[in-house]
């Protein structure tokens, strides 16, 4: 499913019209992950609205790290003050191919570093990222911390004031069928929980210096842990 602001607006309208509500805040620890999103039509609409909200936040900000920092805090996915850290994945090297080198505007002999990480908020993995970057376009200090610590890429290069060019953004899963907003039919209510697959969103992007020079190409896959908090509890007033 391709991200659509008009679809997002319809989601919000549908959710508001479904019930006039007050929301009781909970933390992710109040319910197990298998109980947090019931398999009801309203819960499916809410889940899609939340997922599209994250999608919009990621697409409108240069740093996925900082966006996930805020998401983690706002949805209480980890203890207060927690920040995103990068857990290195070893043994899955992907040398830069011709397409990556073209995106980064480098020739066949220019060194490119590949970094494969899982971005964690507390004990929850929120995304998995493939990152190809040109070390010559970073400072020596940035290269050092990227090579020796669990710092996320976005935090390590933050002082570059970089920009982000989004190439593609895909919803890998939708709790509602395609065309649901043009039909009165929604999935029937289920007594079981809503169980999303492991990955929900995929973004491809290029990060650029202030002068427009590309220095990093990324493929980011966002996990179902981004929804690992209780669905809103809705009470008629």
From Swiss-Prot:
Gene3D superfamilies in alphabetical order: Chorismate lyase-like
Signal peptide: 1-28
Keywords: Plasmid, Signal
Name of the protein in its database record: Uncharacterized protein y4mC
Domain of life: Bacteria
């Amino acid at each position: 499913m391709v991200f659509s602001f008009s679809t997002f607006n319809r989601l919000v309208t549908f959710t508001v019209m479904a019930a006039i509500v007050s929301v009781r805040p909970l933390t992710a620890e109040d319910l197990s992950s298998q109980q947090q999103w019931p398999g009801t039509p309203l819960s499916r609409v809410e889940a899609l609205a939340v997922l599209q909200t994250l999608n919009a936040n990621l697409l409108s900000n240069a740093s996925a790290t900082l966006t996930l920092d805020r998401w983690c805090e706002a949805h209480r996915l980890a203890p207060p003050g927690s920040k995103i850290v990068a857990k290195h994945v070893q043994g899955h090297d992907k040398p830069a191919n011709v397409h990556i080198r073209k995106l980064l505007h480098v020739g066949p002999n220019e060194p490119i570093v590949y970094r494969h990480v899982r971005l964690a908020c507390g004990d929850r993995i929120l995304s998995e990222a493939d990152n190809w970057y040109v070390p010559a376009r970073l400072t020596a200090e940035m290269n050092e911390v990227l090579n020796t610590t669990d710092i996320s890429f976005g935090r390590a290069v933050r002082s570059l004031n970089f920009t982000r060019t989004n190439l593609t953004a895909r919803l890998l899963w939708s709790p509602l069928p395609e065309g649901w907003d043009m039909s009165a039919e929604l999935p029937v209510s289920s007594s079981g929980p809503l169980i999303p697959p492991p990955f929900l969103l995929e973004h491809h992007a290029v990060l650029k210096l202030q002068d427009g020079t590309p220095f990093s190409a990324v493929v980011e896959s966002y996990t179902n842990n981004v929804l690992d908090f209780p669905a809103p509890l809705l009470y008629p007033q």
